[in-house]
Amino acid sequence: NEKVSAQEAAKMLLVTLGYDAQKAGLVGAGWASKTNALADENGLLDDVNTSFTAACPRQYAAQLIYNAIDAKTVVWRDDAYTNQTAAGTDNKTIGEKYMGLNTAEGVMASFQKEDGKSTYTMDLTNISKKNSVEATKNNKFDDLTFTKIAKDFTALKNQKVKVLYKGTDEVYGVFALAE
């Protein structure tokens, strides 16, 4: 029942990303500075504005976990950690690898209530990114339709959004993106 600092939480999440505590220097005298550096490098500290050594407030613990879900996993290869496969493509994120989650970024073209239901349907078009892969001239993504969305995101219609989902009928979040 001890409280956990943001630094300690970040260390646990780095191990979840694939870092070996010994090889990565997350133990011993310099563990704290190495943890801070790797957590920052992997985006775990984005929007985390709290002391790293004091007890971590819930909102920042949740932010650390959210950031980790979207962070690419790492592997040890050629005497260094990398977040890419041997073929040069990005490793899966924690969300993709362990939870079957997907992300897509595009324009919410439509959002409406489903007939006779308390849920909504949404069309995502002009998809620019899917599971950390950027769309290119030769690699375009098909539009996506999501169903059974429990929350009303009508206010985000016609905006660029990021969707966190599992399958097309399990949407966990829709977030506005800065243009």
What role is predicted for each listed range?
Residues 1-140, 144-178:
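N-terminal propeptides
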